[in-house]
Amino acid sequence: MIKDIKSVLKDLNQHKYIYVLRISILQFLMTTIGAYGLSLILRVILISSNIPGMTTDNIVSFLTNPLTLAVLFVYFLLLTFLVYLEFSLLVENIECKEAKLGVRLFYFKERSYHFLKSILGWHFLAFLFYLILTIPFVEFLVSSALLESLYIPNFISGELVKSTNGKIIYFGLYAIFAYFNLRFIYALPLAVTKKDNRFAVALKESWWLTRGTKIFRVLGFASVILIIVAIISLLSAAGIGLAALVDGCEKTFWVETLFLSFIWGVLFAGRLVFKLAFLSYLLKGFDDEASQKLPIKENKKQHRMLALTGLLLVIGGINFTYNALKASGGPSKNLSVIGHRGMVSQGVENSLESLEAAAKAGATYSELDIILSKDGHFIVSHDDNLKRLTGKNITISQSQAEDILGLKIKQNGHESHLISFEDYVAKAKQLGIKLLVELKPTGNEPDNYEQLFVDKMKELHVASSYLVMSSDLKTIEKVKRLDSAIQSGHTISFQLGDFTSQKVDFYAIEDFSYNELLARKAHQNGKKIYVWTINSRDDIERYLETSTDGVITDYTTSVRKIEKELAADDSYLDYFLRLTNLSWIEKL
């Protein structure tokens, strides 16, 4: 193991320039042409289904369209091929080193043939399963440039960790996924090097290579990671020190732009080195005698150095332009901070105590969920079944209001009682805080459900001052038709493509599906956009510097505190920690 680590580090140092040149080109092509090809197919999928975007509202009709399914298959086929091709080229670079790459038309034809052979039949599903399996760990493993921005949506993990059983399930699954990732760590390198292998065979062989104590060979690479992290840290520290020396705490435009560009370059190079080193180390685990081609002549090396210089200038120019635009922007102004079900750290979700805590913390709105009881009363609750908070298997939509109002609810050491929508609104008026009401239809509602809600809003005299949203698009659009004064919104937990409705006033979109392009489109159409559920310090800081209109959070106090810190425009060290999602270090 030590011998392999030394060999990998020596190889990286000896061929660093050619590796940087070739792998930078590969990453650039994958994240531009490859990503564009995938987005183009995605657009074809949406057009073929006659919808502007896919959400949880239309996913059934989306997946029952034969043409859509056919194009979706092509999309996944192209995705898996691009991942396979990327790793094939990475291995080719490691084997060729300074020698000339034999990447011509024949090479792509050959790789396409071997790819199709390796995923034929059910092996295609095995490949997709493998890619999905790696998503929780793309930051820690050798992953494709096309997959590095993927992660488990927070609305899935966030809901799970709110209960003890959920935490056990979440961390248990994480541990199982981590174990399988370690056991299948050799699968993709095996698939691209052993060209006659089917992918499931590669999975099986990887499982064999990591049996027993052999799994510790993979963990031994941690020493190389520490070396790479140390180098990145030293270079970053030098950049921080130089920027602080030149600029102090003023953050002038040009110094800030250069600082952002330098940090991006260091992190980009570090990621490339990590990917190459880890892949090279894995190859030595089963293919130590890999063929290596003859080195090129000295004059060719000079040409490569010129090409490397040119490439760095191009990438550096793009990087500088991007960061110049970023540096010219500023934090969001007048950002709405919306307490998610009140403030759950200070009380049971959707309780009066939680509402009061959100108001004291300075929330712009407090979000709550309401469900209609069997006898037509709106009850404040996120779940139709009350077992999670009451311990009793009672369903709101099948119960009389008098039988459930006042039930004791418990969560995270807090206690309260189930209350009506009317009592909740009365308390909000007393506290001087507005509400964001989320309608939670269960399927048991009467035909006049939306009219009942509109009438209730008018009765409480809050129809024009509160925000109302629902994940059921038909419900919220009907509410808007019944009373145009109500500020209505669509709750979106997952979305691909454009917004599916222009009839609402705002969108509340989950963090996983948010991007700045969607925000700009919403604003161009006169709509607002809110993001949920933003809880970590890094996510809060990131969204405070986007064009979103507001964040829905469990930690209202944290958002207000971080707002003040960003407004103070502190040191370059703080700036660096925010850029690299390492702000938590300051709290150690």
Regions found by a protein language model. Give the residues of each.
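Membrane-interface segments at or immediately adjacent to transmembrane helices
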Residues: A324-D375, I379-V380, K387-L389, I394-Q398, ...
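A cross-domain feature marking catalytic cores of carbohydrate-active enzymes
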Residues: R341, L368-I370, V437-L439, S470, ...
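Hydrophobic alpha-helical membrane segments
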Residues: M1-V337
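Conserved, mostly hydrophobic/aromatic
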Residues: H340, A358, D369, I404, ...
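C-terminal active-site rim and adjoining tail of enzyme catalytic domains
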Residues: L219-G220, H490-I492, G497-L588
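Active-site-proximal loop/turn and secondary-structure-junction residues that shape catalytic pockets
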Residues: L372, N385, P441-G443, K474-T475, ...
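Structural preference for beta-strand elements that scaffold enzyme active sites
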Residues: N334-I338, Y365, G432-L436, S465-L467, ...
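Metal-dependent phosphodiesterase/phospholipase catalytic core, i.e.
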Residues: H382-I486, N525, L579-K587
